Regions:
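Low-complexity, flexible helical/coil segments
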Residues: 52-55, 96-101, 109-113, 189-193, ...
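Acyl-donor binding region in acyl/amide transferases
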Residues: 57-60, 65-66, 77-177, 293-353
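A conserved beta-strand-loop-helix scaffold within acyl/acetyltransferase catalytic domains
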Residues: 9-92, 142-143, 151-307, 398
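Hydrophobic alpha-helix feature that most strongly marks membrane-spanning transmembrane helices
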Residues: 241-248, 263-267, 280, 286-287, ...
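Proline-rich intrinsically disordered, low-complexity coils
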Residues: 20, 26, 35, 39, ...
Length: 401
């Protein structure tokens, strides 16, 4: 166990420790503090991330203690060789392509991510963390970044109410705030999938029924919900790679070891919505469940027939059907393809980055260049649903909270 040296002990008896992995943190503490209805914060999923090759070069956990009690936990992901063209959109990637060919090292951006690589950001705590806890955490984050020579530091995808307790400490440490892509959340509570469809507005309801008919009219297609999908791992990876080849960003790319690890665990509870054309897998949506929440986490599609057979929509319909049958109160989906998800009835959940750089000149450049670039990318992703207020404006109205 390594102790963060600078600001390790606060005036109220708090101390900060840096733990090397999820197994170093007591299970009871994690389960008490993690959101009970968000499967992306299940301990098992973090363990699967650590044992696979999603992209980070390392993981760590900042733990604030007061005596024997755990007051706060903040997961960290360390990227030593992250490339800028992995985290920008396709338009920016095309502009960077000549530089990537000639001087690829210039695109290297060592980065420390704080929060959850695969989900919404949180500081795990019994309640909103207090001023001293936040100050200690932010100071410890910067200590880790300096020690590991990771110049850029990002608190990733925090909802406004999660970021608010940290805001003063972050501002004092030189962080600035940029709106990130929103999460998508579908509120449930219907007794059946048909009741869900009936409650949709007229146009989305007609479109949904039309897409379901188109799927059913195509010979040989069927949907199955699988608990055991070990025999399908090569096919899953192939379909997922088809999707990632068209993706705007490739920060976190799951691999065969992640899928195999998830398949072998009971935590989180998982189901695979699988679509077959005769005996051939042509689409899937990997879903996780915890408490009254579900997440459609990763999708794969055979683009040979995806459009004509409406595969994207129908695996999502089946996931919604499954979540309703499981008694879920909401299901979340990925931060992509917003228009189809809005037609499903999803809310947009506002999220933010807090960012800085350890050195003043790069920090000033980031502060000047990133907000307009990310705002433009957000506008392209959301179209008419893009927020109307500047992404750097403090106290912006929330999409849904």
């Amino acid at each position: 166990m390594t102790t963060v040296e600078q600001d390790a002990v606060g005036t109220s008896g708090y101390r900060v420790e840096l733990l090397p992995g999820i197994d170093s943190l007591p299970r009871a503490a994690w389960e008490e503090l993690a959101p009970g209805d968000d499967p992306m914060w299940s301990r098992g999923l973090f363990s699967a991330m650590e044992h696979s090759r999603l992209g980070p070069d390392g993981y760590a956990y900042l733990v604030v203690r007061r005596g024997a009690a755990v007051a706060a936990v903040l997961p960290l992901c360390l990227f030593r060789e992250l490339r800028l063209d992995q985290v920008v959109g396709s338009r920016e990637r095309r502009l960077l392509a000549p530089l990537a060919r000639v001087l690829p090292r210039l695109l290297r951006v060592p980065m420390l991510f704080c929060g959850n690589l695969l989900g919404q950001g949180h500081v795990l705590a019994p309640g909103p963390p207090g001023e001293e806890v936040c100050r200690l955490l932010v100071s410890a984050v910067l200590d880790v970044a300096r020690a590991e020579r990771l110049g850029t530091v990002v608190f990733k995808d925090f909802a406004p109410d999660e970021l608010d307790p940290l805001r003063t400490a972050l501002e004092q440490a030189g962080f600035f705030f940029v709106r990130s892509l929103p999460d998508t959340r579908l509120r449930l509570g219907q007794a059946s999938f048909e009741e869900y469809l009936t409650a949709l507005p007229a146009k989305p309801r007609r479109n949904a029924r039309s897409k379901i008919r188109a799927f059913r009219a195509r010979p040989g297609l069927r949907l199955e919900v699988l608990d055991d999908f070990d025999h399908l791992l090569p096919e899953l990876l192939g379909l997922y790679q088809q999707v990632m080849a068209r993706a705007e960003q490739t920060l976190d790319v799951i691999d065969a070891s992640f899928l195999a690890d998830v398949q072998g665990r009971d935590d989180p509870r998982r189901r695979l919505v699988a679509c077959f054309e005769d005996d051939r897998l042509v689409a899937f949506l990997l879903c996780f469940f915890a408490g009254s929440g579900a997440t459609g986490a990763r999708i794969g599609l055979d683009y040979r027939i995806a459009h004509d057979a409406r595969l994207y929509h129908n695996v999502h319909y089946e996931a919604i059907r499954l979540a309703i049958a499981s008694g879920c109160r909401h299901i979340r989906f990925a931060q992509t393809a917003y228009q189809p998800k809005l037609e499903l009835g999803c809310d947009l959940v506002e999220q933010w980055y807090a960012m800085t750089h350890l050195r003043p000149l790069p920090r000033a450049a980031l502060r000047r260049l990133l907000p307009p670039a990310l705002s433009a990318a957000l506008d392209r992703a959301l179209g008419p649903h893009a927020p109307g207020r500047p992404p750097t404006e403090k106290g912006s109205a929330r999409a849904t909270g």
